[in-house]
Design a protein with these regions (language model features):
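Active-site-adjacent betaalpha module
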Residues: 1-7, 17, 47-51, 66-68, ...
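Glycine-rich N-terminal loop/short-helix segment of MobA-like nucleotidyltransferase
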Residues: 16-30
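A short acidic, glycine-rich active-site loop
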Residues: 27-39, 79-89
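A short, N-terminal amphipathic alpha-helix
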Residues: 36-54
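Catalytic-core segment of enzymes that process non-peptidic bonds
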Residues: 57-65
Length: 205
């Protein structure tokens, strides 16, 4: 894995998931350890900041009336019914912890569904940057992380999903996806293993 041709794709790091007052905060059980996932992600970003690895944030944002969701089902129906990720709301904002790295993380708008490539410029940008490896972190493992990872694999990218930087709805779901689903199309590893693979050594910050 070459750092100069690798991108860290950050999915769902928004207030509606990670803030205690977020509309979808209760979708994630405490057993999934959301604060640990966030802490691991921030540690990874800090370590990668001086490196040539690209870092991209893909927030999901819906219009006021959710007109882009025609007869939604599943999680998208829940999002519409609860009013989550609505444009202009506090819940749609990227969490402050990630905003602190705004000079290093590129935000790509347009995501309005489960797959981060849909309705965004990700594929074009990754081609321009010469990306070969996509590393995925974020929420929710069984939904947006899995959908995006499968699509990236289908496009021919080498996909890595970080087991300690992705968030399932509970610990059982997270373990199942990391052990049984993700390995079907991706490498699964911790962020420490990724840093070793990229030859980025821990430093005291």
């Amino acid at each position: 894995m070459d750092a100069a041709h690798t991108v860290l794709l950050l999915i769902g790091y928004q207030n509606d998931y990670f803030s205690p007052t977020g509309i979808l905060h209760d979708v994630v059980e405490e057993s999934a350890n959301p604060q640990t996932v966030l802490s691991n992600t921030l540690d990874l970003i800090q370590r990668l900041a001086p490196s040539p690895v690209y870092m991209v944030d893909t927030p999901i944002v819906f219009t006021d009336d959710y007109r882009e969701l025609v007869k939604p089902i599943g999680i998208l129906k829940t999002i519409k019914e609860l009013g989550a990720f609505r444009v202009g709301s506090d819940g749609v904002k990227t969490i402050p912890e990630l905003q602190a790295f705004a000079d290093r993380i590129i935000t790509i708008p347009g995501k309005r569904g489960l797959n981060a490539f849909s309705n965004t410029a990700l594929e074009i940008l990754f081609q321009q940057w010469g990306i070969s490896d996509i590393v995925i972190a974020g929420a929710i493992s069984s939904i947006c992380v899995d959908s995006t990872g499968r699509h990236a694999h289908g496009l021919g990218y080498q996909v890595t999903i970080l087991s300690d930087c992705t968030l399932g709805r509970n610990s059982v779901e997270q373990a199942f996806y990391c052990e049984q689903i993700f390995p079907l199309y991706a490498q699964t590893m911790t962020h420490h293993e990724l840093l070793q693979k990229l030859d980025i050594h821990p430093v005291n910050l």
